[in-house]
């Protein structure tokens, strides 16, 4: 009876240790992500290229590293932005800043937000696209606001690493297989 009780306590300790180790890994990853977000000034410091609109500069599946500390984006700079109301990051190049956009002066003067200065308004386009991105922007939006819409500017990349993310989103059954394999590995790893 005593050996049975002792083995149950030992199993409970092992299970608790595994749960705590798993929680430690998750919390460490979360802290690293948040630390990277603070360091780069971007809410999403790492993104994956989801389409071929920026070829040949970036291919689908490239992993991009972002930084969002500069107050202005320059023409030719590659930025990542979110369309208002949608949570899909778009990677495109800045083709115009406000002073170069003609006929928009009236709209700029009507903006009540004092932080929206001409240098904060951008027009973007994918390198592999024929037209600019005005069709992609939210309804009634003719340009991007640097502070509101831009997630960050590209500062580096690793080719093809993001394909794992693309595969998992395009084939949902792969998530189940991956979780199953990880679960089996955790069960077999008991010491």
Curated annotation (Swiss-Prot):
The keyword Transferase does not apply. The chain crosses the membrane at residues 15-33. SUPFAM superfamilies: LexA/Signal peptidase. GO terms for cellular component: signal peptidase complex. GO terms for biological process: protein targeting to ER; signal peptide processing. Residues 34-191 are lumenal. Residues 177-188 are annotated as: C-terminal short (CTS) helix. Keywords: Endoplasmic reticulum, Hydrolase, Membrane, Protease, Signal-anchor, Transmembrane, Transmembrane helix. The active site is at residues 53, 92, 133. One of its GO terms (molecular function) is serine-type endopeptidase activity. The keyword Glycoprotein does not apply. It catalyses: Cleavage of hydrophobic, N-terminal signal or leader sequences from secreted and periplasmic proteins. It is a single-pass type II membrane protein. Residues 1-14 are cytoplasmic. Its EC number is 3.4.21.89. It is found in: Endoplasmic reticulum membrane. It comes from the Eukaryota. CDD domains: S26_SPase_I. Its main location: endoplasmic reticulum. The C-terminal short (CTS) helix is essential for catalytic activity. It may be accommodated as a transmembrane helix in the thinned membrane environment of the complex, similarly to the signal peptide in the complex substrates. Belongs to the peptidase S26B family. Component of the signal peptidase complex (SPC) composed of a catalytic subunit SEC11 and three accessory subunits SPC1, SPC2 and SPC3. The complex induces a local thinning of the ER membrane which is used to measure the length of the signal peptide (SP) h-region of protein substrates. This ensures the selectivity of the complex towards h-regions shorter than 18-20 amino acids. SPC associates with the translocon complex. Catalytic component of the signal peptidase complex (SPC) which catalyzes the cleavage of N-terminal signal sequences from nascent proteins as they are translocated into the lumen of the endoplasmic reticulum. Specifically cleaves N-terminal signal peptides that contain a hydrophobic alpha-helix (h-region) shorter than 18-20 amino acids. NCBIfam families: sigpep_I_arch. This is Signal peptidase complex catalytic subunit sec11.
């Amino acid at each position: 009876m005593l050996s049975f009780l002792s083995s149950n306590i030992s199993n409970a300790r092992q299970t608790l240790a595994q749960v705590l180790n798993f929680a430690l890994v998750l919390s460490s990853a979360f802290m690293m992500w948040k630390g990277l977000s603070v360091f780069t000034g971007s809410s999403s410091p790492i993104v994956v290229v989801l389409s071929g609109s920026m070829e040949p500069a970036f291919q689908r599946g490239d992993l991009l590293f972002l930084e969002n500390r500069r107050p202005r984006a320059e023409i030719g700079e590659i930025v990542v932005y979110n369309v208002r109301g949608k949570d899909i990051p778009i990677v495109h190049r800045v083709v115009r800043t406000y002073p170069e956009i003609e006929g928009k002066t009236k709209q700029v003067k009507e903006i009540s937000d004092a932080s929206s200065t001409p240098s904060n308004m951008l027009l973007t386009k994918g390198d592999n696209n024929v037209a600019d991105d005005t069709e992609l922007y939210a309804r009634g939006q003719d340009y991007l606001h640097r502070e509101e819409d831009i997630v960050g500017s590209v500062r580096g990349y690793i080719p093809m690493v993001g394909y794992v993310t693309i595969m998992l989103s395009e084939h949902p059954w792969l998530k189940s297989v991956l979780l199953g394999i990880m679960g089996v590995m955790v069960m077999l790893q008991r010491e």
